[in-house]
């Protein structure tokens, strides 16, 4: 999206904070329904990040596939679970939580230090000359459509069959 610098930065910070709050909601809510809705917030924020990066097709696919299908399927399956009542008491920390937090923080610090110490501008991207010509003549959405109908036809159809089988299974569980 072509926005002025301060507005773009504000939207990045706003979406980043929404992403972090949604991720914390997924982890910290004891009710699985609330966690699933927080996951929906996270996926919507990721889709809005794609819009800010001028990748509108990926953003729409993110909304349709993940928020519209996967998150609804998660909520659907959680509603059909017949589990015990959720525990109302909340233990702040256990030993396992401390060890897990320590491992996650150390992985996060090592990832950030790796990102900061990598020379990203020294990478040379090589392409074939006909790929450059093809990218000039056809826009991104048309390229995705061409690749889905030629190169990735079989995996695309297999994924659609897997989703159909999972939907039929969910309907069979709902009928019982």
From Swiss-Prot:
Which keywords are on file for this protein? Chloroplast, Membrane, NAD, NADP, Plastid, Plastoquinone, Quinone, Thylakoid, Translocase, Transmembrane, Transmembrane helix, Transport
Q: Which Pfam families match?
A: Oxidored_q3 (PF00499)
Chief localization: plastid
UniProt keyword annotation of Chloroplast present? yes
How does the record say this protein sits in the membrane?
A: Multi-pass membrane protein
| Catalytic reaction(s) noted | a plastoquinone + NADH + (n+1) H(+)(in) = a plastoquinol + NAD(+) + n H(+)(out); a plastoquinone + NADPH + (n+1) H(+)(in) = a plastoquinol + NADP(+) + n H(+)(out)
TM segments?
10-30, 33-53, 63-83, 105-125, 152-172
Q: A single Gene Ontology molecular function, please?
A: quinone binding
List, alphabetically, the InterPro entries matched: NAD(P)H-Q_Oxidoreduct_6, NADH_UbQ/plastoQ_OxRdtase_su6, Nuo/plastoQ_OxRdtase_6_NuoJ
The record describes the protein's role as: NDH shuttles electrons from NAD(P)H:plastoquinone, via FMN and iron-sulfur (Fe-S) centers, to quinones in the photosynthetic chain and possibly in a chloroplast respiratory chain. The immediate electron acceptor for the enzyme in this species is believed to be plastoquinone. Couples the redox reaction to proton translocation, and thus conserves the redox energy in a proton gradient.
Q: How does it assemble?
A: NDH is composed of at least 16 different subunits, 5 of which are encoded in the nucleus.
Q: What is this protein called?
A: NAD(P)H-quinone oxidoreductase subunit 6, chloroplastic
State the organism of origin: Spinacia oleracea
């Amino acid at each position: 999206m072509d926005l002025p610098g301060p507005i773009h930065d504000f939207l990045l910070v706003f979406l980043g904070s929404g992403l972090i709050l949604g991720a914390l909601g997924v982890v910290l809510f004891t009710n699985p329904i609330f966690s699933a809705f927080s996951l929906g917030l996270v996926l919507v924020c990721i889709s809005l990040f794609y819009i800010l990066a001028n990748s509108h097709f990926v953003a729409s696919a993110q909304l349709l596939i993940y928020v519209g299908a996967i998150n609804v399927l998660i909520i659907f399956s959680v509603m059909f679970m017949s589990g015990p009542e959720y525990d109302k008491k909340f233990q702040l920390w256990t030993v396992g939580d401390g060890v897990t937090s320590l491992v996650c923080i150390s992985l996060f610090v090592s990832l950030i230090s790796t990102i900061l110490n990598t020379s990203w501008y020294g990478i040379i991207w090589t392409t074939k000359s006909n790929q450059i010509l093809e990218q000039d003549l056809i826009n991104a959405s048309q390229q995705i459509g061409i690749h889905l109908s030629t190169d990735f036809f079989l995996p695309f159809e297999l994924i659609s069959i897997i989703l159909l089988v999972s939907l039929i299974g969910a309907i069979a569980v709902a009928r019982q």
